[in-house]
A protein has these predicted regions:
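N-terminal Rossmann-like FAD-binding beta1-loop-alpha1 element of flavoenzymes
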Residues: 3-32
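Conserved Rossmann-like nucleotide-cofactor binding loop
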Residues: 13, 38, 279
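Glycine-rich FAD pyrophosphate-binding loop
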Residues: 22-48
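Conserved FAD-binding subdomain of flavin-dependent enzymes
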Residues: 38, 42-45, 50-84
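Mobile amphipathic helical/loop "lid" adjacent to a hydrophobic cofactor/ligand pocket
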Residues: 72, 80-198
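Helical element adjacent to the flavin cofactor pocket in flavoenzyme catalytic cores
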Residues: 209-257
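Mid-domain catalytic core of redox enzymes
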Residues: 251-371
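Conserved flavin/dinucleotide-binding core of flavoenzymes
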Residues: 332-435
């Protein structure tokens, strides 16, 4: 019997669901619906001043096994090539809205010495150990998946990986229990989490430690894909031999697994995977949907082509990357590219609210162009999160409920893998039958 599977969403979760489903069902028909005109989900790019600029999901980590393995399979190049924290020739700072409380070159030992001087060697060791232990627990999911373990719910994932404690306390509380100083939490922790999630160290310890590890504080190296991180997800869909329908919005799924699109067209499938947040997808489902009870966090991105007025920051020249404490008017700021056509650097802000022209005129001495975007990017990853089932209704599955515990491109890819395995168990896929 040839199965027909529908996937709603062509981001990390949707593309890896498709890729894994193809491994289970060599002859299945896999159709991916994506309401945008590009694949990649939050790893989105825009054309700005003649350059392709990534506006979200910009960094990957060497421990991201699913993405790293597929990138290697696809022959994708890294940019920059696998740098470790302390190897990048740039500068990074923490700004409190008035002054830089931390500032250092990220090149070589100078960065490490600056960290030790500000935060203390033993604090940094304890941070690295705590982040490393958490990531080691999370990374055990790969061997479990490869061994044929099927997860029916996010609760199953948390229990199998022994991450219950990390989901029940905040990063701040967890750090305190590990004797990591408040300064580390309020400057390093807050700076990175404000940049990554637009949130604070009061998020769950699991989400916080995943964020810190993703910034290099558990070892490993950071990188991006030369052609943009979305190239991995486009490659996953190609390897899945999926039919990808861009610009096609699904508005409903019936009890009989019939999909309805925005144009009124209908189509029947054997199973449907919603690879997008239930509460944001705008899809009427055959059962009361489970949602991320804590809601989603809005992120504003502002791209600016221009010349920075260093005096705004009290320095002759703005650093390459600026993280911030809660008293600052934006979450993070940094140079992300260079417009060859305009011969101007391109900068990116993350902020909680829209940054107006008046504010930008203070930061920049001259501005050629501005591009603003806003979206509900991440769930609010609170302590004691909802641990919902991946199965919404008979034949209807969802990947994004896992975002309640942590949310990165890799964890979404892992969720897609888990859901594909669940579908395979329910529909007798080849790998499921062999296990």
């Amino acid at each position: 019997m040839t199965h027909r599977f529908a996937i709603i969403g062509a981001g990390a979760a949707g593309s890896f669901t498709a890729r894994r489903l193809r491994q289970h069902f060599p002859d299945a028909e896999i159709v991916v619906f994506e309401r945008e005109q590009q694949v990649g989900g939050r790893a989105a790019t825009v054309t700005f001043c003649g350059e392709q600029v990534e506006v979200g999901g910009t960094l990957l980590h060497s421990s991201n096994r699913r993405i790293v393995e597929l990138a290697a399979e696809l022959g994708l190049e890294y940019s920059p090539p696998g740098v470790a924290l302390g190897d990048m020739d740039a500068s990074v700072t923490v700004w409190d809205g008035q002054r830089f409380v931390f500032r250092a070159s990220t090149k070589g030992m100078a960065f490490l010495f600056s960290l030790v001087r500000r935060y203390g060697l033993f604090n940094l060791r304890r941070l690295r150990a705590a982040a490393g232990e958490t990531i080691a627990k999370w990374n055990s999911i790969y061997d479990k998946q490869d061994a044929g373990v099927v997860f029916e719910s996010v609760g199953d994932v948390v229990e199998a990986l022994e991450l219950g404690v990390e989901t029940k306390v905040s990063l701040r509380e967890f750090a305190r229990s590990r004797k990591i100083s408040e300064r580390v939490v309020d400057e390093i922790g807050a700076g990175i989490l404000r940049n990554m999630y637009n949130q604070t160290p009061d998020i769950s310890s699991l989400a916080g430690m995943v964020g810190l590890a993703g910034a290099g504080f558990a070892g490993g190296s950071l990188f991006s894909i030369e052609r943009g991180n979305a190239a991995v997800f486009a490659g996953a869909l190609e390897r899945a031999d999926a039919e990808v329908r861009l610009g096609e919005t699904v508005v409903g799924v019936s009890n009989t697994l019939e999909l309805t699109t925005e144009t009124g067209a209908t189509e029947a499938f054997d199973a449907v995977v919603l690879a997008a947040p239930v509460e944001l997808a705008g899809v009427a489902l055959p059962a009361t949907p489970t949602t991320t009870d804590e809601g989603y966090q809005r992120v504003h991105v502002t791209l600016v082509a221009g010349l920075v007025n260093g005096s705004y920051f009290g320095v002759p020249e703005a650093p390459g990357t600026i993280f911030t404490t809660p008293s600052a008017p934006f979450k993070s700021f940094g140079r992300v590219g260079f417009s060859e056509s305009e011969q101007l650097p391109i900068y990116k802000f993350f902020s909680e609210t829209e940054l107006g022209d008046g504010f930008l005129s203070q930061v920049f001495g001259s501005i050629l162009d501005v591009h603003r975007l806003s979206w509900l990017a991440y769930p609010k990853m609170a302590v004691n999160p909802s641990l919902h089932s991946f199965n919404l209704a008979p034949g209807v599955y969802t990947t994004n409920v896992q975002e309640a515990i942590c949310s990165t491109l890799e964890t979404e890819a892992v969720a897609g893998w888990s859901v594909a395995d669940l579908v395979a168990r329910d529909f007798g896929g080849r790998a499921a039958a062999a296990s």
